[in-house]
């Protein structure tokens, strides 16, 4: 992101406007896949990141207290990056239905086709501190196993080793 910000500031306003009309404008930004169990705060993490989201004012988008669960995925186009907010269901080891698996595979194919290598620049893994504190060892182990499987699948899909950024949410509620 620092490299992107540096080059963006070197352009004149007219050059920046023309550049935003191109496909490269989105593809050159860093892309992050945001994953985590249901209710871990993935959408809130993005929404409260302090990023300036493009067209937010135009479409009347504003912060809400209860964002609710993400169905399949949401795309967040920010000034300096792109976030793909995924459904918490995608991490379940044996609970992902056929429709969810198809949606995930379609998303990964689209990213790989339109973005080329590396596809995504990193994975933001969001875990709930309250859940980590109160879950049984068996539950934590099950989620850890599911995370490992999904991270290996993503590395295989995007044909690269991806950095994983761990975020612990809801620390203020402990």
Label each PLM-derived region with a short phrase.
Residues 98-174:
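Conserved C-terminal guanine-recognition region of P-loop GTPase G domains, centered on the G4
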Residues 86-92, 130-135:
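Conserved P-loop NTPase mechanochemical-coupling segment
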Residues 2-91, 118, 170-172:
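Conserved G1/Walker A P-loop phosphate-binding module
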């Amino acid at each position: 992101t620092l490299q992107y910000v540096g080059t963006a500031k070197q352009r004149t306003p007219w050059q920046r406007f023309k550049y935003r009309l191109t496909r490269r404008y989105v593809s050159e930004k860093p892309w992050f896949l945001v994953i985590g169990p249901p209710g871990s705060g993935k959408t809130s993490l993005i929404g409260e990141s302090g990023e300036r989201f493009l067209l937010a004012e135009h479409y009347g988008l504003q912060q809400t207290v209860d964002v609710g669960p993400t169905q399949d995925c949401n795309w967040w186009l920010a000034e300096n990056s792109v976030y793909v907010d995924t459904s918490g269901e995608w991490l379940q080891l044996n609970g992902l239905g056929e429709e969810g698996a198809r949606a995930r595979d379609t998303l990964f194919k689209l990213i790989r086709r339109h973005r080329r290598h590396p596809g995504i620049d990193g994975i933001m893994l969001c875990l709930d501190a309250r859940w980590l504190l109160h879950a049984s060892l068996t539950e934590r182990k099950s989620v850890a196993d599911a995370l490992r499987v999904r991270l290996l699948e993503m590395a295989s899909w995007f044909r690269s080793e991806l950095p994983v950024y761990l975020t612990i949410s809801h620390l203020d509620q402990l």
